[in-house]
A protein has these predicted regions:
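Cytosolic covalent-transfer regions centered on His/Cys nucleophiles
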Residues: 1-146
Length: 146
């Protein structure tokens, strides 16, 4: 990847969504707003969620588009939204962090693995949940750009 996939302006805390659908739309709007995807990609994010949950555990969900929506990705990017109150992603699946991902080609796999590394460490998850705001959150997770 030649450019940072995560920039400070794509980190939002707190997010304003109260439902899973609102959170996916909020993440999608950030990706569209930065020029990474077309609006059709956001529709594909919702379509994927209807087929398979993107809940990952550890308060995390990673909504992303379908294979058919690859053509709607302009450049690789991700956004992170943290919510003060948990969003019910599914039965018994509380989410406070939503990471929207768009990856050109196979880049989404390396992006996913970097996010997984961060969220596989319980101490890191607690830091992300406790971060004072978007600047501190960005500092904690900017390693996804490495």
């Amino acid at each position: 990847m030649t450019a940072d996939v995560l920039t400070r302006d794509l980190v939002v805390a707190p997010g304003s969504a109260r439902t899973k659908d609102e959170a996916i739309a909020e993440a999608g709007a950030l990706l569209v707003g930065c020029g990474a995807v077309t609006p059709a990609y956001v529709d594909a994010m919702a379509a994927r969620e209807a087929l398979v949950s993107t809940y990952m555990g550890s308060w995390l969900a990673i909504p992303h588009g379908t294979d058919e929506s690859k053509g709607d990705i302009v450049r690789s990017a991700l956004c992170l939204l943290r919510y003060d109150e948990p969003i019910e992603w599914g039965a018994g699946q509380p989410v406070r962090v939503v990471v929207g991902i768009a990856g050109v080609g196979e880049e989404h796999l390396s992006i996913l693995s970097r996010i997984a590394l961060i969220f596989s460490d319980p101490a890191r998850v607690e830091e992300v949940l406790a971060a004072a705001g978007p600047d501190e959150l960005y500092a904690l997770i900017q390693q996804v750009n490495e």
